[in-house]
Design a protein with these regions (language model features):
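Flexible mid-to-C-terminal extensions adjoining Fe-S/redox cofactors in radical SAM and related proteins
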Residues: 116-213
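Radical SAM enzyme [4Fe-4S]-AdoMet core and its adjacent flexible, acidic
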Residues: 1-106, 111-129
């Protein structure tokens, strides 16, 4: 989990992981979500520091190839080296993920939405696994409202964002917690998870391939 305090520790983190033989690493970002009303990464210098953090990790990994792989770098690099582009994600496609709580209440889209209570939507339970089929859940007014807003938000991303093929329209929970609605586009979470990572990876690949002076 990366917070603002971690952004000055790229060398320490690389040395720790490589020194302990941990060669596959993935970072989760501190997000504005649920009880965490504000991420420390939202500070004014957060994006600059995060980019510098990623650039330093890229440099260290390039100096010692094979010692450590970073999930975030691998994901962007694999898309950049192929013709594949994302059209959506499991977290904005209905029933790609099915979430069931201890009472049998069923939600879909982001797992983070299960059991959440909100003023605008109530909770995000669409029915009960013991009483309803998925087809019945999909026919409820609440599900149709959430699906319509998530789909509209994905389309906003598709039409306005040059990173869409790397992101697939983002995660509904991030949009809701940051903007109060699913029907919106860019989030701070996407800036950190996709956009800034893509900028660093593509710049690093171009340099390694001799495509820049």
């Amino acid at each position: 989990m990366l917070t603002a305090d971690a952004l000055d520790q790229a060398d320490a983190l690389f040395d720790f992981f490589s020194g302990h033989g941990i060669n596959n690493v993935g970072f989760n970002m501190e997000e504005t979500e649920g009880e965490n009303a504000q991420s420390t990464l939202e500070r004014p210098d957060g994006e600059r520091r995060y980019r510098a953090f990623l650039e330093r990790l890229w440099q260290r990994m390039s100096e010692r190839p094979g010692v450590m792989r970073l999930r975030e770098f691998d994901g962007i690099a694999s898309l950049a080296c192929s013709d594949e582009r994302l059209q959506n994600t499991d977290m904005n496609a209905p029933f790609a993920i099915v979430n069931v709580d201890a009472r049998g209440q069923v939600s879909t889209f982001d797992p983070e939405l299960l059991s959440v209570q909100t003023e605008a939507y109530g909770d995000f339970s669409f029915g009960n696994v013991l009483q309803h089929s998925l087809a019945e859940l999909a026919d409820t007014p609440k599900f149709q409202r959430v699906l319509a807003e998530i789909s509209s938000g994905v389309e906003r991303c598709r039409q306005s964002c040059g990173y869409f093929g790397l992101c697939g329209g983002g995660a509904g929970s991030n949009k809701y917690w940051e903007h109060g609605t699913f029907d919106c586009s860019v989030t701070q979470a996407c800036r950190y998870r996709i956009q800034l990572v893509a900028d660093v990876v593509l710049a690093g690949m171009e340099q390694q391939l001799g495509l820049v002076a």
